[in-house]
Amino acid sequence: GSEMCIRDSGNNLTSFMNVIGLMREFGRRNIVFSSSCTVYGEPEKQPVTEQTPRKPATSPYGNTKQMCEDILRDSLAAYPGMKGIALRYFNPIGAHPSALIGELPRGVPQNLVPFITQTAAGLRECLSVFGDDYPTPDGSCIRDYIDVVDLAKAHVAAINRMAGDKNKQAYEIFNVGTGRGVSVLELVRKFEEVNHLKLNYKIAPRRAGDIIAIWADPTLANTLLGWRAERPLEETLRTAWQWQLHLGQR
C-alpha cells in the first residue's frame, strides 16, 4: 500500500537524479522524461493544457512526477547545452497489435484495463468500479485513455524534435492524450462490446486519491511534435484482450 508507494517514490527520485548526473558525466545532451497527468492534481476545468496550473498531487506517485519535472527544469537551466522534453502521459492502455508485447503487472493490477482483462480471463473474481456517485454523467471517474502504441510514437517524435534542434526552449512539456474523456463505466461497457463478453463487476466505495475527471488538450503535441493519437479506443481494448489471451497460452 502506501508504504510501498513511498519506497517507490524514493527509488524514482534517486534513479532520476542518477540519470541526470550520468548524462553530464558522459556528455549526453537530450532526455525524454516520462511524466504524468497526475501532476495536474484535481484540475478546475477540462481539458487541461500544458499551461494549466499544477495543483497538489493526490498521490505519492503524482508528487514524485512533480518533483522530477522540477529537477529536470532546474538541471536544464543549470547545464547549458542539455535539452529535455517531459511527456505528460494520460492513461496508457492496450498492447502491441501483434499481442506479443503488453502490460504484465506484478501482483494485483493497480491499473483499470489489466484488472478488466484479468477479470474477463477468470483470473480475478470481480472488477471493482470505485465510486458511481461522482459529479459526472454516469457517476464514475473520467480519464483520457491513450493507446500504448500512440504513446511510443510520441517518444519518437520528441527524440526527433531534439535531434533536429527544433526545440523552442531547453525544457519543453507536452500532454500526450487523445483529448477525449471516457468514464470508467463507459470503458467497461466498450470492452464488453468489442470483445463480445460480459464482465463481472460491482460498484465499490470511492478510492482515496482518485480525482473526478481529467482529459488532455493535445494541441501543442499535435502542432509542435507533429504527433496525434490515432488508434481508436475499440481497437485498443481489442489488443488489450488479445494480449491477455496470449499470456494465457504461454
Residue ranges and their predicted role:
Residues G10-N18, E25, N30, V39-N91, ...:
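Catalytic helix-loop patch of NAD(P)-dependent Rossmann-fold dehydrogenases
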Residues L112-R250:
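C-terminal substrate-binding subdomain of Rossmann-fold SDR/epimerase-dehydratase oxidoreductases
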Residues S36:
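Residue(s) in the substrate-gating loop at a strand-loop-helix junction
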Residues H96-P109, I116-T119, E125:
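Hydrophobic, Gly/Ser/Ala-rich alpha-helical and linker tracts in large acyl-processing enzymes
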Residues Y40, I93, R180-V182:
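Feature marks short, surface-exposed loop/turn motifs that line or immediately flank catalytic pockets
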Residues G1-I6:
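Short, small-residue-biased leader/transition segments that mark boundaries at the very start
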Residues G21-L22, R73-D74, T117-A121:
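Alpha-helical segments that scaffold the active site and NAD(P)H-binding pocket
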Residues I31-F33, I85-R88, D144, N175-V176:
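Structural signature of the Rossmann-like NAD(P)-dependent dehydrogenase/reductase core
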